[in-house]
Amino acid sequence: VTGSNGKTSTKDMIAACLATKFKVVKTQGNFNNEIGLPKTLLSVQPDTEIAVVEMGMRGLGQIRELCEIAERDVAVVTNVGETHMELLGSMENIARAKGEIVEELTAQQVAVLNADNEYVAAMADKTKAQVVTYGYAGKATFRGDNVVTTAQGSVFTCIDSRSGERTEVDMPFIGEHNVQNALAAIAVGAVFGVKLNDSAKALRTAKLTGS
């Protein structure tokens, strides 16, 4: 998982959804650099089925370097924003740096991309992987609709545009950004065969880093 914002929350939500079906290890906190990532991989046990890891960067080439440490089957990009602008100088360079996570994926692997962020959506053209998208956009594979967010949490409908299946999600995380993070988690869960309803239940009780 990488992105300018939302990496840690998305990682936590993904791990919660996958844990309904698999033995999961995840990055603790936001240990997402060349030191923290190997620490996470060292926590993998013989019975671990999926590792959910967060990848951060401070410049071009760093995500690629982390990908050499952790060969991934699914890559998630949450968004491209102005974080690290002082290091990379332009949104295009930030997108290039984040996009390194999908560039080497094969046709057997999956890129999960935010359909609402133009820089992330454009990464679909830079990968050989199968592309699954999420967001509010009508073209998103997993689309959020009927979103209500209050001081107590968020309620929304997730629609799988391929099957038309819908599920209601009621979770204790506030803000539309967390709805997007949840949609990413549901999308990743679906890639691994987790039912939408099971992901919705997991999100109801998921714990986010720092909360």
Over which residues does each language-model region extend?
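Phosphate-binding loop of NTP-binding sites
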Residues: 1-115, 121-127, 165, 183, ...
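Heptad-repeat coiled-coil segments of the DHp/HisKA dimerization-phosphoacceptor module
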Residues: 116-117, 160
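Adenine nucleotide phosphate-binding catalytic loops in nucleotide-utilizing enzymes
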Residues: 91-92, 125, 129-211
